[in-house]
Amino acid sequence: MVSSVLRDARRIVVKVGSSLVTNEGRGLDEVAIGEWCRQLAALVRGQGGEPREVIMVSSGAIAEGMKRLGWSSRPGEIHELQAAAAVGQMGLAQMYETKLREQSMGSAQVLLTHADLADRERYLNARSTLLTLLRLGVVPVINENDTVVTDEIKFGDNDTLGALVANLVEADALVILTDQKGLYTADPRRDPQAQFVHEAQAGDAALEAMAGGAGSSIGKGGMITKILAAKRAAGSGASTVIAWGREPDVLLRLARGESIGTLLVAQTQKNQARKQWMVDHLQLRGSVTVDAGAAAKLREDGKSLLPIGMVAVEGDFVRGDVIAVRDAGGTEIARGLANYASAEARLLCRKPSAEFERLLGYAAEPEMVHRDNMVVLGAR
């Protein structure tokens, strides 16, 4: 199965942990980061196959900050952790920028918190930014914004962030690079009878019992956080691979279809997962009515909804809220995330995108609802 899952994946989120990035806390591992960046660049360029879109979620800011500050053990005080993150993030960003630039590849630093992805408007802004970066051929390097939040430092981990980013951009696969070969039935460092798990279903409750609390002392996450991250990623249809980050050419070989590490398979197809989320779980905040031409484009071609095709707006909603799209007869034909608030949408009805800036003073997007953020109900 791994051969088809990773070989066919076109949008991949790669998460690499603190113990790998910082060589078990001894400082940023320049050689290893350079190797991952070389592989990321090769994937983006389509070496040996189709071009891929890749996002790197990298731990290491706190660990690098500890090293720069001369601390040998992880402090318990939140403000000290935040200070370490602020110091370490400088070096982390510089290293990725340098190593990706050596591959003639652009990079972008994106710092997120879980709150950014819980708020609909900020979620939509983050998604739009990341998709634009991918379209430009830039590699986003994402980390949690540990300097300004506390819960993520105390209880969170970048395995979870990697899964949330996979949900955010509708990735085909999440690759978690760790200091372990993959998942075992027990901790192999303590149990010589532990068996390696080559493949399982993401979300299988038995996996959590297997994972236990095994993990390094440098970062916050053990294997259990990776199991839970795979379960979360599967919610949007992304399968997860857990593999040893120092395996030679691990990313390129996975992309070629080699069986490396543990594959946790998502049981829900990506499009089905998004439809279920959009249709069944998000509360409608309003609706727009469209003319016959726009309705036909949505039903038949799955096109984005442009304001020029809208004839009426109902309800009170803000950017990022879920709205229904109805035809002239009142039948709901789609629903999706609004790019404009209801008051703005009323001004944009029947207007071409060239007039948006004159009417609003700015132009966010040319679409009222982008097709990537829309579910056509007739296609359920």
Curated annotation (Swiss-Prot):
It holds the Pfam family AA_kinase. This is Glutamate 5-kinase. The gene is proB. One of its GO terms (biological process) is L-proline biosynthetic process. It catalyses: L-glutamate + ATP = L-glutamyl 5-phosphate + ADP. Keywords: Amino-acid biosynthesis, ATP-binding, Cytoplasm, Kinase, Nucleotide-binding, Proline biosynthesis, Transferase. The keyword Transferase applies. Belongs to the glutamate 5-kinase family. It is an enzyme of class 2 (transferase). Its EC number is 2.7.2.11. PANTHER family: GLUTAMATE 5-KINASE, ISOPENTENYL PHOSPHATE KINASE. One of its GO terms (molecular function) is ATP binding. The keyword S-adenosyl-L-methionine does not apply. CDD domains: AAK_G5K_ProB, PUA_G5K. ATP binds at K15, T178, D179. SUPFAM superfamilies: Carbamate kinase-like, PUA domain-like. Its main location: cytoplasm.
